[in-house]
């Protein structure tokens, strides 16, 4: 852990970490887009029901 020599990270582990990072970023982008769009949609829906 801290101060201990660490072994090299294998290419497989690097690739797995990269894929997980990309997946997380994609998911975060979808959530951000949803949170940005949902108030507009909610406003339009409420307007239609008046």
From Swiss-Prot:
In terms of superkingdom, the source organism counts as: Eukaryota
Q: Which GO terms describe its cellular component?
A: mitochondrial outer membrane; mitochondrial outer membrane translocase complex; mitochondrion
Question: What are the boundaries of the region Disordered?
Answer: 1-20
Q: Which residues form a coiled coil?
A: none
Compartments it resides in = Mitochondrion outer membrane
> Entry's InterPro entries?
Tom5
* Record note on quaternary structure: Forms part of the TOM (translocase of outer membrane) complex that consists of at least 7 different proteins (TOM5, TOM6, TOM7, TOM20, TOM22, TOM40 and TOM70).
The protein here is known as Mitochondrial import receptor subunit TOM5
Gene behind this protein? TOM5
């Amino acid at each position: 852990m801290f101060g201990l020599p660490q072994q090299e990270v294998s290419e497989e582990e690097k690739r797995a970490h990269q894929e997980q990072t990309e997946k997380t970023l994609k998911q975060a982008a979808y959530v951000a887009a949803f949170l940005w769009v949902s108030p507009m949609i909610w406003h339009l829906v409420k307007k239609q029901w008046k």
